Amino acid sequence: MLERLSTEYRNKNTMNLDEMSIKEVLEAMNQEDRKVAIAVHKEMEQIEKIVRNVISSFQNGGRLIYIGAGTSGRLGILDAVECPPTFGTDERQVQGFIAGGMKAFTKAVEGAEDCEELAIEDLKGIQLNDKDTVIGIAASGRTPYVIGGLKYANYVGAKTASISCNKGAEMSQLAQVSVEVETGAEVLTGSTRLKAGTAQKLVLNMISTASMIGIGKVYKNLMVDVQSTNQKLVERSKRIIMEATEVDYKEAEAYYEKANRNVKAAIVMILLQCEYGEALEKLKDAKGFVKKAL
């Protein structure tokens, strides 16, 4: 029942929300938001377990799949679509699914989140298998679409995890690893796009970033697999080469082009004074880790 969910409680600090000044509303929201990172920190051990599973999936040719409805689904898609430009992943390696399909990203699809079968169809459509990791996201922890997806993921032998914002969440019973970030009552009663959504975004940031570090997508704290899909990212790529090798802009630009705009290869070429082909071989032998290639 909804009344048992802490995300549905009324916030005692905002009972007169409609009478507050704009500044008071903003102060109240900011005060509540400060609690989110603390709540996330309490789940760190569980988040670490998820990251280890995701890294294992990636190392064995598997994928990371997010499933959710409404805000939760949108956050999963948001995290997934940022992976190719940031980490140079194939667009199939990290995917997000939302109840009702992509049209539900911008407009609510009535009844979609209440159907377990829709999630099963979505996961069958990508030939989900035992190499993959599926993460179900739902603030309530009881959305049927997400529950259906987790059941099917377990059935095919995939690794499963859940992210909810209520303790004792129903979907935690279906996931091999469960994260329950208890964010409590929202400023606006039941509006889980607020603190609950913020908590989910923080957890997803951790999972994708730490997992990508674990498969060699980062050198020091530089995104060395960045894809230069626009002029801003072209310039960022050159700056990354400069930071990693301490060469000037002109030399970084020259090696960037010599390396066919492959930032990792350019860094290895400069630091080891080798040719492009040799740099690629060293990176291959090092499974993509720049530090190991050096």
Swiss-Prot record:
Q: Which UniProt keywords apply?
A: Carbohydrate metabolism, Lyase
Report the enzyme's class at the first EC level.
lyase
Biological role: Specifically catalyzes the cleavage of the D-lactyl ether substituent of MurNAc 6-phosphate, producing GlcNAc 6-phosphate and D-lactate.
Q: Which SUPFAM superfamilies match?
A: SIS domain
GO process annotations (BP): amino sugar catabolic process; N-acetylmuramic acid catabolic process; peptidoglycan turnover
User: What quaternary structure, including any partners, is listed in this protein's UniProt entry?
Assistant: Homodimer.
Q: In which pathway does it act?
A: Amino-sugar metabolism; N-acetylmuramate degradation
The organism is: Bacillus cytotoxicus (strain DSM 22905 / CIP 110041 / 391-98 / NVH 391-98)
Q: What miscellaneous comment appears in this entry?
A: A lyase-type mechanism (elimination/hydration) is suggested for the cleavage of the lactyl ether bond of MurNAc 6-phosphate, with the formation of an alpha,beta-unsaturated aldehyde intermediate with (E)-stereochemistry, followed by the syn addition of water to give product.
Report which reactions are catalysed by this protein.
Answer: N-acetyl-D-muramate 6-phosphate + H2O = N-acetyl-D-glucosamine 6-phosphate + (R)-lactate
GO molecular function list: carbohydrate derivative binding; carbon-oxygen lyase activity; ether hydrolase activity
Q: NCBIfam families attached here?
A: N-acetylmuramic acid 6-phosphate etherase, PRK05441.1, PRK12570.1
Q: Which Pfam families match?
A: GKRP_SIS_N
Domain (SIS) ranges: 54-217
UniProt record similarity statement? Belongs to the GCKR-like family. MurNAc-6-P etherase subfamily.
Q: Which InterPro entries does the record match to this protein?
A: Etherase_MurQ (IPR005488), Glucokinase_regulatory_CS (IPR005486), MURQ/GCKR (IPR040190), SIS_dom (IPR001347), SIS_dom_sf (IPR046348)
The protein in question is named N-acetylmuramic acid 6-phosphate etherase
Q: Which residues form the active site?
A: E82 (proton donor), E113
What EC number(s) does this enzyme carry?
4.2.1.126
Return the CDD domains for the record. Answer: SIS_Etherase (cd05007)
